[in-house]
């Protein structure tokens, strides 16, 4: 509860690593009729998570919001559209254009998941991440984070509303079939 409150969400679910968060959460949230839309420079754990899903996968050019919109236009309007983006891109060090991604979320009825692995502890008030930095925490559906960067520990988490966390608790295979975190 404290971790979820820190990043501005109802609940959080802890995993053994940050990598297992993305590789388990992404396939648990989508199925064959859904779309995953990712920045082409997203972290390897996001790439593997989308590969493990059976959803239709679309990539947009790095931080190119016109291309993101072009990819969203390809989606069936009645299907789930999950936009997944790094808050801070680990190789480039630049920030996702969250204000524009949120605008497109509303225009195309999409869901947003932000990987805060490199933003947590650095950006936002008291290190709450890039979502907080832009004042958009309430607009972001899922916030992922890791303990292995600024928090200097082991493990990862996903934070969202209670219904999403409950779904993931019972459907994210990397949570169900993995070892628990170290104390």
Model-derived segments and spans:
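Active-site phosphate-binding strand-loop segment of PLP-dependent enzymes
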Residues: 58, 62-114
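Catalytic P-loop NTPase motifs of RecA-like helicase/translocase cores
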Residues: 44, 91, 120-121
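Active-site C-terminal subdomain of aminotransferase-like
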Residues: 108-111, 118, 123-183
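Short, structured coil segments at secondary-structure junctions
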Residues: 32, 52-54, 108, 139
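Short loop-beta-helix segment that forms the pyridoxal 5′-phosphate
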Residues: 1-24
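Conserved PLP-anchoring active-site segment centered on the Schiff-base-forming lysine
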Residues: 25-44
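Conserved Walker B
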Residues: 41, 88, 117-118
